[in-house]
Amino acid sequence: MKRLGAEFYQAPTLELAERLLGKIFVRCEDTGMVTKARIVETEAYLGEGDEACHAWRGMTNRNRAMFGPPGHLYIYFTYGCHYMINIVSEQEGTAGAVLLRAMEPLEGIDRMQERRGTADERALMSGPGKLAQALGIGPELYGSSLLGESCWLEDAPEIPEELIGTSPRIGITRSTELPWRKFVTASPHVSTTRLGAPKKKRQKRLERR
C-alpha cells in the first residue's frame, strides 16, 4: 500500500482524528519484524481550550513534541504501566495531537499475542495502552517522524461516513463534554466503552473550540 506523505498530517486536529480511521499503522523493528494494524478509534486533543490536553498550560519538557511538526509521535507514560501513542497535528508551534485509541491487528499477530500475553485478537489492541504494547512502542520513539523507517501509515479506503461514531472522550476528568472521540461503529476492536452513535451528516467544518 502507498505510504501517507507529510500533507496527510497537515490538517486540523479534529479533522485528522476522523481521517485516521481505517488507515494502516506499520511498525518496523530494527530486526526487520513488521507489525501492522488498522486504526479504528481515535481521540482529538487541542492545546487551546481543552483542559484535558497535556499542553493546555503550555509547553513542558514532557509535552514538547505536541508543539512540533505534524506527523510526528507524541508518546507518554500513564497509570504507572502504559504508554500512549499520539500523532502530532496542527502547525508547528501550535499544540495538538490525536490519540490512537484502538486498532485492528492485521500482520505480525503472533508477535502481538506474545507481547500482550493473550491469544484473543479482539483484546490485543482494544485500548491505547494495549495497542502500544502490541506494537512494541515505547519512549524510544518519542518525537519520531511517521515519514521514517520505524513507523509509518499506509493509505486505505476511507471509512464511510455512516459508519463513523462520535462521542465524548474516555477516561478524562476535564473538558468531558467535548465530543472528540471518533470510532468505527462496525469494528469489534474498538475499546469496550461504546458511547455515541453514528453521525448522520457531516458538519460544515470541523473547527477548534
UniProtKB/Swiss-Prot annotation:
EC main group: hydrolase
Species for this entry: Chlorobaculum parvum (strain DSM 263 / NCIMB 8327) (Chlorobium vibrioforme subsp. thiosulfatophilum)
This protein's name: Putative 3-methyladenine DNA glycosylase
Keywords: DNA damage, DNA repair, Hydrolase
Pfam families, alphabetized: Pur_DNA_glyco
Annotated HAMAP family: 3MGH
Lineage of the species this protein comes from: Bacteria, Pseudomonadati, Chlorobiota, Chlorobiia, Chlorobiales
Enzyme Commission number(s): 3.2.2.-
UniProt GO BP: base-excision repair
GO molecular function: alkylbase DNA N-glycosylase activity; DNA binding
